[in-house]
Amino acid sequence: MKKVFVVGQQKWYSEWIEDHVIADNLEEADIVMFTGGEDVDPSLYGCEKHPTTYSNIARDLEEKAVFEKVRSDQLCVGVCRGSQFLCVMNGGLLIQNVSNHATFGTHQIIRADRDSERYEITSTHHQMQYPFNLRKNVDYRVLYYASRRSEFYEGVVAPPSCEPEIVLYTVADKPVCLAIQGHPEMMRAEAPVIAMLNNLIDQLC
């Protein structure tokens, strides 16, 4: 039984994880979950704020303090804003404005090493992870991506080579963060993407 500590106590974000209980504190958790909400403040990744960015620096700093206490035997999982936050904490940047992703419906994500494997997942975001050329000693792997849905990529110098949807961050080949851009908590329990994500988490922790 996995113990999940939901940062900020928005416990419904973890409901899609099978066979889990809510941890009351960080120390006892197997999984530390960072959830959705406001945009991450660009000051955390050294950029100027785009006019469309709405951030809460107090929340960012509180969650940064939690992230810095996470042990090497714990897995961080980020959902939507949480995925972007984990990108930043691992030295990445954010694309501050994209189109055709804040649909409040679903869109398709594609497995990076097997493009015949595709899933539908709920999408509500206007920002996006930019894990390319990480500034820290962290490696990343884009596990799933979206086919260039956006008409523009505002807030970065170069467009992304793909639109990252699920990114795994590792340190010395050890998984440390699983960043999920979509909203699995908004999907039906029987949706294929839920089984895929649970299988992935089982492999990582």
Please name every model-derived segment.
Residues 1-79, 88-95, 99-126, 130-173, ...:
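N-terminal beta1-alpha1 cap of cysteine-dependent amidohydrolase-like domains
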Residues 83:
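Catalytic nucleophile loop
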